[in-house]
Amino acid sequence: MTAIAPVITIDGPSGAGKGTLCKAMAEALQWHLLDSGAIYRVLALAALHHHVDVASEDALVPLASHLDVRFVSTNGNLEVILEGEDVSGEIRTQEVANAASQVAAFPRVREALLRRQRAFRELPGLIADGRDMGTVVFPDAPVKIFLDASSEERAHRRMLQLQEKGFSVNFERLLAEIKERDDRDRNRAVAPLVPAADALVLDSTTLSIEQVIEKALQYARQKLALA
């Protein structure tokens, strides 16, 4: 009998710290890593590259079905490869982020990308970073964590990230964009952003990243009975 690889799902809104947590957990456990948000960003970027309308579900489905994407972990960094090109930086722009949120709202697009995401499930295990990993993609995952933080704290973190990269940022505009995106993600008809019924809800608003990692790893090891 073939062993089924265990999955730890980390869901939550943008800016809660999922990416940092997932990389740390994957490194600590030596597991594979899936950044599902990157897949939607890659599809959005591919649509922009190929001049496909991100508001057209019919146009996006064939692109999603044949999306050439893979993840390569190098020295603790996750490289996102689209059609043989490293697009790790390009998919993190605000334009692509906004387009990705639109793309993710289409049922047939999500279905086309579902199989691709599930194919990342391999031994010894998978850390799955996203918004509906525990509710839709891996509903049988033995460990589910929903990482949250206040919209103000997430806007503050995003502002610091952008400022470190040399961008001039308006906090109020950034906060408004995050709230608008939250509202869209939480209230969409397909796979809304909600914690799975059996997920641990972890609020990172007042926690350091080290505290978040410690709590998440402790919970996962208890659930999986790992040393």
UniProtKB/Swiss-Prot annotation:
Q: Which Pfam families match?
A: Cytidylate_kin
Supply one GO BP term: response to X-ray
> Subcellular location, in the record's words?
Cytoplasm
What reaction is this protein's catalytic activity?
CMP + ATP = CDP + ADP; dCMP + ATP = dCDP + ADP
Any GO CC annotation of this UniProt entry: cytosol
- Binding, ATP: G12, P13, S14, G15, A16, G17, K18, G19, T20
Q: What is its EC number?
A: 2.7.4.25
UniProt keyword Transmembrane helix present = no
Single GO term (MF): (d)CMP kinase activity
Question: What function does this protein fulfil?
Answer: ATP, dATP, and GTP are equally effective as phosphate donors. CMP and dCMP are the best phosphate acceptors.
The protein in question is named Cytidylate kinase
User: To which species is this protein native?
Assistant: Escherichia coli (strain K12)
